[in-house]
Amino acid sequence: IDIIQNIPLLHPIEVFDNIRLIHELDIGALKLVSAADRGTQKDFGDLLLLCGLYSLERLHSELLKRESMFTGKEFGTIFNVEGLPSGLARDLSALGNFNRATDRKSESNRLILTESATIPRSWPELDQRWTGMVEAYARSKGLRFSPPSRKRKWKNKGLGL
């Protein structure tokens, strides 16, 4: 089974034990788009792991390079049928939208880390580290970063809430 399907890549595919693997830099660029679009806990966790290997600046640069080469309907994929740019060239605000990431009803939105994980094991700490990283990068490059306000979940604690 080949799981790499019609996604244009910047880097050669690596083969390990007869399994084709997408290069980490291609994954990083695609994860930025995924985090901006759907923003699951797994997306943000994966990005923090990738930023342990490559800087956020490098991943963002790879994304911009991808979008300069692969924009248009002929480069559409199952994730982006029209092949449109992500909108992350000058505005990184979508990378701070955690409103969907806190919805734990969906199994695909849960990040379960092992004891040896190199990223924060609590969601609030992971959220804070990622936001700080994006904010610092945006400021250093003169990019916009103004994430939407967070949805507040009120719990009934007998106080009329």
Predicted feature residues:
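Structured mid-to-C-terminal alpha-helical surface segments
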Residues: 1-39, 45, 52-161
